[in-house]
């Protein structure tokens, strides 16, 4: 018997609703009541917070049990309720895929790489300046003096002195070159900050692959360690179809699911094909996969260049709109300055292309990580060949489930609205 139904009523679900139904209801209600979607409603923020609190309680099994038995006063999270906007971003910001793909580091690492590269360049420049300052300038001074003497016709009068100076200068230059060579050798031994960071990231990536491999083996073991009949396979498919139906509504969830499914299916198919025809069966699939990697790389670079070009175009438009002087094209015709609406449209276009570039970069990273994970799972020499074949078959089955997942028209519309809100929330968070 539930003593208080207020939270259930806020989410519009029954007291017997499953955790999946509760999460879906929260997603739908939070979109409807989000303050950004109700700018002229002063009570929207309050309703949004109430919906968030309801989900924070009903979305936690222990808190939900306390709420059902004792009411809301006995069902307060240990650290208090989180801010609704923060909760909204955390729940639907991509963390749900962490056990499949780990934390996406590419975009973060790009920024860090640029910073470290700039630091290394500055340090290198500083070392060059210090080396120049430490090297004696006798040779240069003598060279200059000799040139001046020659111009003035004084070479005969100072011939002996010039020889001495030249000899001295040559010794100094030789010593300086020797010192520069030593500095250069030391510089090669000394790793730059960027190189150190790249090595650290490689270690972290391997740790991530190891952990994700263990998690994937556990998932596949639901089938591989079973009786392994048709009933078990159907049960396995149903379990992950339910999970996929929840994950598909995450931010870019459907794209991520399809990416995971493609890699699982592809790697499993290559492995299974390699077990036939003396291992020759997997060559075609492997070549096809390499072609896919090339195309993914090409799309990633193209999307980044496209976003960069759009950004440059927007900068030109902004400069033109703020310039008080009349503007002319290369033929001498006066150009019309862009309006506020045109600038807004270009900004919207840029946002879309930046998101596209970010997604292609993320997809490239996801694919790279998952290929490493699948390789480790299917090349595990601690288990029998029979187990590896079962793993590949289960992986292929899971890949099929994820590849076939789709959104209904209504779900797609809701997801698009939701993804816009997440992007806006992330943008606001960066500026606070």
Swiss-Prot record:
Record-linked InterPro entries: DnaJ_domain (IPR001623), DnaJ_domain_CS (IPR018253), DnaJ_X (IPR026894), J_dom_sf (IPR036869), Peroxisomal_DnaJ (IPR052814)
Assembly with partners or alone: Interacts with SLN1.
GO biological process, one term: protein targeting to mitochondrion
PROSITE patterns (alphabetical): DNAJ_1 (PS00636), DNAJ_2 (PS50076)
Molecular functions (GO terms): protein-folding chaperone binding
Places the protein is found: Cytoplasm
Presence of the UniProt keyword Metal-binding in the record: no
Organism for this UniProt entry: Saccharomyces cerevisiae (strain ATCC 204508 / S288c) (Baker's yeast)
A Pfam family annotated for this UniProt entry: DnaJ
Keywords (A to Z) from UniProt: Chaperone, Cytoplasm
Family named by the database record: Belongs to the DnaJ family.
Region called Disordered, residue ranges: 117-187
Record function comment: Required for peroxisomal protein import which maintains the function of peroxisomes.
Protein's name according to its UniProt entry: DnaJ-like protein 1
Domain J stretches: 4-73
Chief subcellular location: cytoplasm
Gene Ontology cellular component list: cell periphery; cellular bud; cytosol; endoplasmic reticulum; mitochondrion
Further facts: Present with 8970 molecules/cell in log phase SD medium.
